[in-house]
Amino acid sequence: MMRFHKACHRFSLSPLCHLSPPSPSPASSLLLLPKLSGFSTLSTRRCVRVRRFSENPLTTVMASRSASRLRSLASACSGGAEDGGGTSNGSLSASATATEDDELAIGTGYRLPPPEIRDIVDAPPVPALSFSPHRDKILFLKRRALPPLADLARPEEKLAGVRIDGYCNTRSRMSFYTGLGIHQLLPDGTLSPEKEITGIPDGGKINFVTWSNDGKHLAFSIRVDENGNSSKPVVWVADVETGVARPLFNSQDIFLNAIFESFVWIDNSTLLVSTIPSSRGEPPKKPLVPSGPKTLSNETKTVVQVRTFQDLLKDEYDADLFDYYASSQLVLASLDGTVKEVGVPAVYTSLDPSTDHKYLLVSSLHRPYSFIVPCGRFPKKVEVWTTDGRFVRQLCDLPLAEDIPIASNSVRKGMRSINWRADKPSTLWAETQDGGDAKMEVSPRDIVYMQSAEPLAGEEPEVLHKLDLRYGGISWCDDTLALVYESWYKTRRTRTWVISPGSNDVSPRILFDRSSEDVYSDPGSTMLRRTDAGTYVIAKIKKENDEGTYVLLNGSGATPQGNVPFLDLFDINTGNKERIWESDKEKYFETVVALMSDQKEGDLKMEELKILTSKESKTENTQYSLQLWPDRKVQQITNFPHPYPQLASLQKEMIRYQRKDGVQLTATLYLPPGYDPSKDGPLPCLFWSYPGEFKSKDAAGQVRGSPNEFAGIGSTSALLWLARRFAILSGPTIPIIGEGDEEANDRYVEQLVASAEAAVEEVVRRGVADRSKIAVGGHSYGAFMTANLLAHAPHLFACGIARSGAYNRTLTPFGFQNEDRTLWEATNVYVEMSPFMSANKIKKPILLIHGEEDNNPGTLTMQSDRFFNALKGHGALCRLVVLPHESHGYSARESIMHVLWETDRWLQKYCVPNTSDADTSPDQSKEGSDSADKVSTGTGGGNPEFGEHEVHSKLRRSLL
């Protein structure tokens, strides 16, 4: 499925893939103001947990007084609302005086940021969009606002790396759509009036929206509220022509099991659905008396190194609970009401129909489970079935994979990447030849195999290709053309091979062999077209009076002046290419989104080419258009309003500068609307970034992104402080370079400080930032960066904001981020990189924020707890805020608003005046205006590390 997540909307063009809205995150679109649940008390489960420390010994007395005042206000707070009426969100009373407000900030209660920030975050969300298979209709999927904290507070089971809502039998914290509407795409490029999908229950929560192959039906799940909880999901279908929706099953006792695979279209009238087994009964009960001690043993002396995974199974009771919630009964359900159970209940994780709709690839997990790795490494069976449920054969039964090495490019032993060819019903897989250990030197390293769905007796798998790097997938076209990808992270090498799957006498050849870091040499990716079977294959293009084999290459067009996306017509045999489309370079940033003339058999004619493009500028949000050949006629099909008109005239510039070692650096500088440095003077500045590793100085210095891209502002984005008249230095590059055999992190601190110094000097030189009023911030690895900069470069920054970070690398001993040496192999590196070890050096105010339920590997909540205690133990001015029920990324409106309030308070108090005992802290929150304590204090707010897409949306690994 193609998704385009710009500032405030998203497209999907793959009708066979499930559409389910993402959980709100810093990159999510702006969302609408929801009703907030009332809180009867200000308990620690419902209110932000704040810890603070001040160098002044009087703080303890003042904190005690503040706590007493909070207790006296608790009942009043629980009855008030942010607008002065209605249900409460647990916020403090708006009648508090300025002095009381800052004292109360030391305690508990959710707060609101100033109106200029709040209004941007509360802007209405634009629907997500999905094209029909024939590209003649657009489905508008309507979304709700930021969810209330009550949604996150629902009980959840944490099992094998999965968080489960046991009442619904779904993943917990699932967001949803609230309504569906269909527009016909008219010949002139305009949209018909909306046809609303009717019949959906009031308040229905919609997920997993998918088109049938012929585009005549939609399938989706619906949950409704029952006694304060969401019901178990039920599968519904809608007739696209009439717009009428109805339940798929006649029985009201058949529910969807949405823990793993939900449902797939087998043909245009039949779905294969994962259902809750009707006979499963009540969930297992935890024994009151344990049957014995918990034991882990390694008497076989097996080397098992794993990262700090979270939410793992703890005992046999957890294993039983995992089986209970994850096990499904597969059911074939036709639109005419016919129902047939297939197979036996099992933990099915994937259902993949073949291109001819005769076979299924069925994947399932089974025991023995593990207590040290998540379910993705559990024993796994992959089988071939017919679509009516008949077992054909077993492809593999992979054992438990606890011993995958931590080195980059290490993989599971045995068959992997098992799937169908996109152009015919043949199974495809890769097998490692190095035992999965990237440190082993072997050739070949991977072998790619292919075999028909039902091989003849004695028929051996066919070797499709042998690779010396790690296999990375295949783009299929037909028996004469496919592209095989391989790469190796340590060297950043990536290669693309051309093969002829149906011709053994045609030798594979290398098409591209380059560095993945070298964005200037990126030739682009082949464009795919949709087949009648619903799969995607390489689009072959036919030119008039030309027998060449042409494909379309869609590239980002990175240049020293910024990205200029392009579309090339590429001769796969000669390497010759012709640029048939290119983005505007002066004012607009345009991209090719998808091929729209793909519902045709055979090669596509150049003169019939139709593509979907996007267009935006620094101040104009993204709109979508159709472009038709041969005359390149443009038909705009969307007209989304500006999501935050109050910042429509913000100033944006991509700036370049140099580090003292000669490395070229870039950043995006944002300035408030109407700001003139010659008249207004320098501004307070927020420096928000995220480091990245590189193998070469040249690659590190390349420009990424475009100066003409629209400034999308997420709900926790640093750009929100443009509304508070800050200069924002967004994503200043902080390359940590390890050339040759050198590991990047061997000189982490040195390169980190040098990059920050260069960025600060540049904004000061330009006269837009006051040197004494620059704050630094980031989340996850960006929070780690923030703490290190305050420890090793305190002269650069007035204060810091660190959200959901990890600060003590000895607590992640088997690697972190892109570091794959262990603590015992690189002890000095782990210690020197850990700001925890330099807590005694941090003298500038630091705000720590963390979700109480952070499940990101490496960033356990205790990282912030322990770092705060280390800082407090050395008299640092610090504040820690722990957000109840929040994970690595924050989603509840109460949490997000409080994070913004905490961040704004910190900036106004310690950056704008740049004094630790400032007596002003302007805050126009409904709950009261902030005022400084009479003693130096530090406190905290929160934001996740894993969602800052402005800086690291394309990072290769999960942030640790």
Swiss-Prot record:
Main enzyme class: hydrolase
InterPro entries: 6-blade_b-propeller_TolB-like (IPR011042), AB_hydrolase_fold (IPR029058), Peptidase_S9_cat (IPR001375)
Highest taxon listed in the record's lineage: Eukaryota
One term of GO molecular function: serine-type endopeptidase activity
Keyword Coiled coil among UniProt keywords: no
GO CC annotations on file: chloroplast; chloroplast stroma; cytosol
Disulfide pattern: none
First and last residue of the signal peptide: none
GO annotation (BP), single: proteolysis
Active site: S780 (charge relay system), D854 (charge relay system), H888 (charge relay system)
Biased composition regions of type Polar residues, renumbered to the chain: 89-98
Transit peptide: 1-62
Biased composition (Basic and acidic residues): 924-933
Region annotation Disordered: where it falls in the sequence: 78-98, 915-960
Protein name as it appears in the record: Probable glutamyl endopeptidase, chloroplastic
Organism: Arabidopsis thaliana
